Swiss-Prot record:
Extracellular side: 1-38, 102-108, 171-198, 290-301
Tissue distribution of the protein: Ubiquitously expressed.
GO molecular-function term, one example from the UniProt record: G protein-coupled receptor activity
Record: glycosylation sites: 4, 15
Disulphide-bridged cysteine pairs: none
Full protein name: High-affinity lysophosphatidic acid receptor
Location within or outside the cell: Cell membrane
GO biological process per UniProt: G protein-coupled receptor signaling pathway
Transmembrane helix is among the record's keywords: yes
Homology family: Belongs to the G-protein coupled receptor 1 family.
Membrane topology listed for this record: Multi-pass membrane protein
Length: 372
């Protein structure tokens, strides 16, 4: 019986013949290229595992770091760790050997785990984005650690329910030699296409739309606030001076209103969103083409494109901990604490001693830049 796909690249369609001859993946990439890709993949696995493990360890060991936003970031890091352990190694072996060596049952399980952990990471990023929207645009800071834990638990359950059909509904499975990766593949069954579209919409298009709207609103709010503060800063300061009976004195210098604590965390999440979009847009388009285009699915370039787009989704797991250490000072300092002294090449920069607690605080003009 020929193998096409239902929702997975390795699932069978009983009544559909294959129009083109299978490809031998051992000749899809040259041996030197496969070795280079394997080395890069191993480095990606190491960075994704160690970097995200440090993030989780920091939040676990330091009670001061267990804020709502850090709990969410730790959950995002944990989902990336699971990807690096249960999905990325098998992709590396497939690239080296040119075939799937782990059996059809594990291929189903592997596909389910891939979507499970990806959905969880996307759900956490969506929660963080909506939280930033509520704080900056709506002036509502309602997410505390307890509520964050509830939302994390709910996101795990929802992600599991969405990814579960990938492994429950398909029992007759074989791994085609032409593309032994468990990805969405061509199907003519309406139910399978509906599930595939639902999966891609849940993973990319809904989160992307909601986050894009949130960030556009946030950017507009920050811009309007900056203009308003700049316009009224001088009059506010002069009003304070007049109360002291000092109107005859020289006008004070323009006060510097600190908006950094309000925007820096948002900027970090915006960078994560941009990384998510760049890494997942190609794979989402690729997956939809695989489901609906027989010509594309059986083209000679399918395996190469599939490998590249899959790699991009893995890169997100590698970049996230790098972004945390780059953008979040407390994470950077904690990372330096975990590193041996001989590897501490970054200079110790004295940080500010205070930080604001509630991001929805209204700012007023002051003589010194406020601490973050």
């Amino acid at each position: 019986m020929g193998c096409n796909n239902t929702a997975l690249d390795n699932c069978m369609l009983p009544n559909l013949s294959i129009a083109t001859a299978p490809l031998d993946l051992r000749f899809a990439f040259s041996t030197p290229l496969r070795m280079l890709l394997a080395i890069i993949m191993i480095l990606m696995i190491a960075i994704a595992f160690l970097g995200n493990a440090i993030v989780c360890l920091i939040v676990y060991q330091k009670p001061a770091m267990r804020s709502a936003i850090n709990l969410l970031l730790a959950t995002l890091a944990f989902s990336d760790i699971m990807l690096s352990l249960f999905c990325m190694p098998f992709t590396a072996v497939t690239i080296i050997t040119g075939s799937w060596l782990f059996g059809t049952q594990f291929c189903q399980i592997s596909a389910m785990l891939y979507w499970f952990f990806v959905l969880e990471g996307v759900a956490i990023l969506l929660i963080i984005s909506v939280d930033r929207f509520l704080i900056i645009v709506q002036r509502q800071d309602k997410l505390n650690p307890h509520r964050a834990k509830i939302m994390i638990a709910a996101s795990w359950v929802l992600s599991f329910c969405i990814s579960l059909p990938s492994v429950v509904g398909w029992t007759l499975v074989e791994v085609p030699t032409r593309a032994p990766q468990c990805v969405l593949g061509y199907t003519e069954f309406s139910a399978d296409r509906v599930y595939a579209v639902m999966l891609i919409v849940a993973v990319f298009f809904i989160p992307f739309s909601v986050m894009l709207y949130s960030y556009l609103c946030i950017l507009n709010t920050v811009r309007r606030n900056a203009v308003r503060i700049h316009t009224h800063a001088d009059s506010l300061c002069l009003s304070q001076v007049s109360k002291l009976g000092l109107m005859g004195l020289q006008r004070p210098h323009q006060m510097n209103v600190d908006m950094s604590f309000k925007t820096r965390a948002f900027t970090t999440i915006l960078i994560l969103f941009i990384g998510f979009s760049l890494c997942w847009l190609p794979h989402s388009v690729f997956s939809l083409l695989s489901v609906f285009s027989r010509t594309f699915y059986y083209s000679s370039s399918f395996y190469s494109i599939s490998t590249c787009t899959l790699w991009l989704t893995y890169l997100k797991s590698v970049f996230n901990p790098v972004i945390y250490c780059w953008r979040i000072k407390k994470f950077r300092e904690a990372c330096l604490e975990f590193m041996p002294k001989t590897f501490k090449i970054l200079p110790n920069v004295r940080g500010r001693t205070r930080r604001r607690i509630r991001p929805s605080t209204i700012y007023v003009c002051g003589e010194h830049q406020s601490a973050v």
